[in-house]
Amino acid sequence: MKHYDFFPSGALTLNGRIGKALAKNIRCRLETLNYALMVDPFRFRSEDDGAWRCEFWGKNVRAAILAWHLMPSDTLLQKIKTTVKDMLSTQTPDGCISSYPADKQISGWDVWGRKYVLLTLLRYYRLIEADPAILQACCRLVDHLIGQLTGEKADLRTCGMHDGLASCSIVGGIIELYELTGEKRFLDFARSLIESGCSLKENVFDAALNGVAPKDIGNAKAYELSSCFEGASIFYRITNELRYKEAVEKYFRAIVKNEIFVTGTAGGKDDCGEYWFDGVKNQVSADPGCGLGETCVTVTYMRFCEAVAALNEYDQSPFDEMENSLYNALLGAMNPSGDRWTHANPTPLTGGGWKASPPDQIKRWFNTPFDEHDCCRAQGPEGLAFGAAHAVLKLRDGVMINFYEDFLLHDTTASGEKYSVEVSEDYPASGKIELFFNSTRPLMRKIVLRIPAWAENCELSLNGENIAVHAGKYCILERIWSDGDSVKIDFKPKVKVIRPADTEDVFALKYGPIVLAASGKNDVVPKPDNIFEPFADGCGKIVNFKQGEIVLCDYASAGAKFSPDDPLRVFFEEKRIFDNE
């Protein structure tokens, strides 16, 4: 069990940048999708070309369920219920739910697609309707898969893509199913996958424990590999087998150290930016020879951060990482209309890179159009909803606040006492927040506040009395709260110079959690040691700064035209400062 959970649907209202982006994505994307079309490959078992149409239903509907949980809408709820019923109608008497014809099943991306169906049905069961028919369908789906693993295909690592990583990443869903049913056969199946190491190349968990660099684990496919480690985190929480906790934590530390860009995404090596490749060092290259930062990797990294956070009650570093990804790479990947997402992110980050909406992925690779679907266009909404859902979390005896989005929370204690918590002040732009507690009578509650690692000079007061806090540590206020109690936090952000490890003469700039970018074709380089002045008239929707004639805005807003005529720059070369003087 995790030490936190989501609040009931509708209890939390997000009013800031994240909430507004989520509302737009619901309205402009999730409520407009043709869900029936995404079910068709399963109904007709027509995916005979080895493609991955099978992932789009699960990815999109899973995101829609969590988005609905945060922002209830009759329109979206009806679409979700209709399409879930539609998907269940494709399950044959043997339990199979697959988009692949019988003779091609458990090859290609088939099990990967089944994974997303399983995860979506489980989320539906947890967040919308605990219908026994849903759980029964999940059991039959997994039992059918287990029954197919015989003879030459007895080892799931031999079935599918990336040396087994894609197929074996279903392990997290298998363990979730065990949690809900208590059926030992599902735990046994999950154990067999975990103990196989999930890759034909090697046991990826042993590799992490032995300190192997992420780029050398398995085939280094960041999305699939990290999904297997997410499954290992869930496995540890069920079995308490310490080696898997240690493997997950070592892998997390290794990718933070070696792979995560300043913007909170990662990935390179191919055109789409899909592989671990010493990203910290290579993100500053003017010619990386690949795309940088697949949005699917951003979202998977955010999910993996949460899987790490679930291992330790008060280790906030995974949420520090998630905040960076959420406010920069993830928000920056959604186009202003709210219906499209970048695949690879701007390449290079040293200037000239621009945000681009990807084409129909199935048409591109298989010459058969599929409603302009793309894996990252399907995954982006999950990242947005997932990040929003972890801004404020329910504790057994209180509230955990990770991201200081303006919000209003209405909660009820176990004994039926109602209270509310409200946060305002337009974080992160203002660098400050004010929290108000309201209740009809005094209540014992715990309010846990994340103090970001970058906020070294943070000041916090409770009802006007200063309380010592430490950057990178949660502040735990466990007390009897009265109506009108208030907390003020001044994070005291300033523009900081970021010089990635193992790089020379290159720097980026951050204001609190926000990466600053130069939008447009201006090649003038700011002086890192000079003062940056905030101003109101720039293109940034979160922050704008200038230094003389040099204008910078938040990375999420930069390059908003999604056009080669609107490039952006994140990294600046120090030697060019002198060239410009």
PLM segments and residue spans:
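Short beta-strand segments within Ig-like beta-sandwich modules, predominantly Fibronectin type-III
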Residues: E465-A471
